[in-house]
Amino acid sequence: MWTALPLLCAGAWLLSAGATAELTVNAIEKFHFTSWMKQHQKTYSSREYSHRLQVFANNWRKIQAHNQRNHTFKMGLNQFSDMSFAEIKHKYLWSEPQNCSATKSNYLRGTGPYPSSMDWRKKGNVVSPVKNQGACGSCWTFSTTGALESAVAIASGKMMTLAEQQLVDCAQNFNNHGCQGGLPSQAFEYILYNKGIMGEDSYPYIGKNGQCKFNPEKAVAFVKNVVNITLNDEAAMVEAVALYNPVSFAFEVTEDFMMYKSGVYSSNSCHKTPDKVNHAVLAVGYGEQNGLLYWIVKNSWGSNWGNNGYFLIERGKNMCGLAACASYPIPQV
């Protein structure tokens, strides 16, 4: 019944950080590394310190070089600044080529017109706080719960916090694989046929694979139907966000995205095909800035990443394949 689809955000937490060319680190870079270590409460062995300083200095230089050029977005230091992109891919992203083109559309697009901008965060208490997936490739679960939390709140006026850990532990029969990855569309199907998902207070997040502990008597949110938006139909995504609720989508994360800080993310290094997506997030709105169309997107790397846990990404160009497998749930309320 369920076609095999790719995994998102999969990957074990490996210790190798990838090779970094030896740098001559200057005093300014050492100062910023020391400050960054204090901010992020980092400690290292002597050997590890030397390696992490090298990686940090390399990332610092990339950030400075990027910000001096004419880009639509700025980079900044964050929790990833002592890691190479090779290490980040092992820890947070699925490193093999992916393909979500098997997702079958059932969305019927209207003719508009639609508002020039939309931000569900400004529509009352209908977008839950930014969460942090931590040391688990579970972005797909946070995209799923974020979409359903908003859909329920919009339909009923009740905001709740749903259990990502239930999806990590229990949704394997729908081609999801816990901390090794999955897709929101498949997670919505699981909730639909499982007849519910528990709240996070009853099924707290631990950020690692565990035994399924679902208790149907404690289910608090339910899915009536799952809507899969047509492959690469970004206009349909706009309609869905404008008229209905936030939309889950996947895209390809490349190195320049990891240090995103502000502005509208756009990249020439990512692919626009459905076979490369490796991270799932939640579109909560859209708009335009200086003639540049963008999506407002909720991430799952904590509120200290990006712009309070959010980022903007260019809209209308299928940037990094973001229109490859978008979906949202219709809640049963």
Curated annotation (Swiss-Prot):
Known EC number: 3.4.22.16
One function term, GO molecular function aspect: cysteine-type endopeptidase activator activity involved in apoptotic process
User: According to the UniProt record, what class of enzyme is this?
Assistant: hydrolase
Pfam family example for this protein? Peptidase_C1
Q: Check the record and name the Gene3D superfamilies matching this protein.
A: Cysteine proteinases
Which InterPro entries does its entry note?
Papain-like_cys_pep_sf, Pept_asp_AS, Pept_cys_AS, Pept_his_AS, Peptidase_C1A, Peptidase_C1A_C, Peptidase_C1A_papain-like, Prot_inhib_I29
Q: Which UniProt keywords apply?
A: Disulfide bond, Glycoprotein, Hydrolase, Lysosome, Protease, Signal, Thiol protease, Zymogen
Listed under GO biological process in this entry are:
adaptive immune response; bradykinin catabolic process; cellular response to thyroid hormone stimulus; dichotomous subdivision of terminal units involved in lung branching; ERK1 and ERK2 cascade; immune response; immune response-regulating signaling pathway; lysosomal protein catabolic process
Q: Which residues form the propeptide?
A: 21-95, 104-113
SUPFAM superfamilies from the xrefs? Cysteine proteinases
Where is this gene product found?
Lysosome
Reaction(s) catalysed (UniProt annotation) = Hydrolysis of proteins, acting as an aminopeptidase (notably, cleaving Arg-|-Xaa bonds) as well as an endopeptidase
Q: Which residues form the active site?
A: C139, H279, N299
Give a GO cellular-component term. axoneme
Cysteines paired by S-S bonds: C100-C325, C136-C179, C170-C212, C270-C320
The residues the entry assigns to the signal sequence are 1-20
Function, as annotated, reads:
Important for the overall degradation of proteins in lysosomes.
Q: What protein name is recorded for this chain?
A: Pro-cathepsin H
Q: What is the lineage of its organism?
A: Eukaryota, Metazoa, Chordata, Craniata, Vertebrata
